[in-house]
Amino acid sequence: MGGKAQNGEDEARGKVLSSLPPSLVPYAELMRVHRPLGYYLNTSPYVVGVVFGAAVAPTKLPATILLDRLLILVLWSLFLRSAGCVWNDVIDMDLDRQIARTRLRPLPRGAVSSWNAVMLTAGIFACGGSLLSFLPRECAIEALIEIFFALLYPFGKRFTDFPQLILVNIGWAIPMSMHSLGLDPLAYKKPTFFMFLFIALVIVMIDVVYSRQDTEEDMKVGVKSMAVRFKHSIELLSYAFFYASTGALLAAGYYSGLGIPFTVLSVGGHFGGFLYFLKTTGVGKAPQVESYAKLACLIASLFWVVGLFVEYYLRV
């Protein structure tokens, strides 16, 4: 089963990359266009943030406004994710050469120069930044915070056992999405805090589980991570993040005054989707972790959004 799943993933990646001109393939690899999991994880918080903002806003927001903000923020998240991946490979090139799963990436194998990769990073960030002119000023400040942590992240694994905590910054998608709708997150302090915390816990949980597949090699080359630090209690840690994220989502709904649709669909979908992920992967032991993570994230995020959308739709 695991071998078939892995072969399926490799085939899908091959189809994506083979559809591009050969000269662009290494750059597409740097941007991880063939690895949709990261795009799910970076895009879904903005989608959730917009629908969450719509569900808690004092008046019912026009659907056209929501769709406009969704388009801009989803595009921003794609640029942010792509630039972060390229930058990560620039900083990690010496480490990637020593790890089996990463040693054939474009920079370690010499398909792209470091200078070109740095220029690509800057260009992608610039393209993403151009979108911010269509959003309120507060969104630009939050985007700068996200960029700062995206640039910082690859250094974390060299100096701390907790680099995954830097990924907490992805939770900034919630206040940024609310600001894009003209809402002040500070006017909804508890709901915003718990939704931010929810997103942060989910992202860290997935990254910790995903990192487990590299634990042995990471230890050999000196890469630090929570998966390495807690290698003997990774199941306990992962389930702690899972239950804490469920509690945070419940709290966000409670303090927002959201009702049964949110609790049943958003919270229930999250609980079922990621419990399935942890069980089927053995908390990162199974070889098809990425495949199950994509499925769990897709299912759970759909339920997050559907529950919030129903709450928005039912408003008078």
UniProtKB/Swiss-Prot annotation:
Q: Which reaction does it catalyse?
A: 3,5-dimethylorsellinate + (2E,6E)-farnesyl diphosphate = (3R)-3-farnesyl-6-hydroxy-2,3,5-trimethyl-4-oxocyclohexa-1,5-diene-1-carboxylate + diphosphate + H(+)
Instruction: List, alphabetically, the Gene3D superfamilies matched.
Output: UbiA prenyltransferase
Any GO BP annotation:
novofumigatonin biosynthetic process
TM ranges are: 47-67, 71-91, 115-135, 139-159, 162-182, 191-211, 234-254, 258-278, 294-314
Q: Which keywords does this chain's UniProt record carry?
A: Membrane, Transferase, Transmembrane, Transmembrane helix
Q: What is its EC number?
A: 2.5.1.-
GO CC: one term? mitochondrial inner membrane
Effect of inactivating the gene: Completely abolishes the production of novofumigatonin as well as asnovolin A.
* Pathway(s) the chain acts in: Secondary metabolite biosynthesis; terpenoid biosynthesis
* A GO term for molecular function: geranylgeranyl diphosphate synthase activity
What domain of life does the UniProt record list for this protein's source?
A: Eukaryota
Q: Where in the cell is it found?
A: Membrane
Q: Which Pfam families does the UniProt entry name for this protein?
A: UbiA
Q: How does it sit in the membrane?
A: Multi-pass membrane protein
Q: Which family does it belong to?
A: Belongs to the UbiA prenyltransferase family.
Protein role: DMOA farnesyltransferase; part of the gene cluster that mediates the biosynthesis of novofumigatonin, a heavily oxygenated meroterpenoid containing a unique orthoester moiety. The first step of the pathway is the synthesis of 3,5-dimethylorsellinic acid (DMOA) by the polyketide synthase nvfA via condensation of one acetyl-CoA starter unit with 3 malonyl-CoA units and 2 methylations. DMOA is then converted to farnesyl-DMOA by the farnesyltransferase nvfB.
The molecule here is called DMOA farnesyltransferase nvfB
List the top taxonomic levels of the source: Eukaryota, Fungi, Dikarya, Ascomycota, Pezizomycotina
